[in-house]
Amino acid sequence: SPSIAAMTKLFDLTPAEARLATLLAAGQSVEDIAANLELSRETIRNRLKAVLAKTGTHRQAELVALMSRL
């Protein structure tokens, strides 16, 4: 999958959004990511909504598929 730096440039993601996208592409769940980053699930879900909007995807599975093609 692409690097965090590449994701920020390709889709105008913030570093936090790009990190979330790469962790999801690596197979981590929203719950695991929230726990590991010591953030609430709601914060992670809000970031995910922003990532989906910026990448033109509508579901987490679409985002992971997109990232696997990059």
Segments predicted by a language model, with ranges:
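Short helix-to-turn junction characteristic of helix-turn-helix DNA-binding domains
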Residues: 24-28, 67
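The N-cap/first-turn positions of alpha helices
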Residues: 16-20
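Recognition helix of helix-turn-helix DNA-binding domains
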Residues: 27-62
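Linker/hinge segments immediately adjacent to helix-turn-helix/homeobox DNA-binding domains
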Residues: 1-15, 31, 70
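Pre-signature/interface helix of ABC/ABC-like ATPase nucleotide-binding domains
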Residues: 5-11, 22, 53, 65
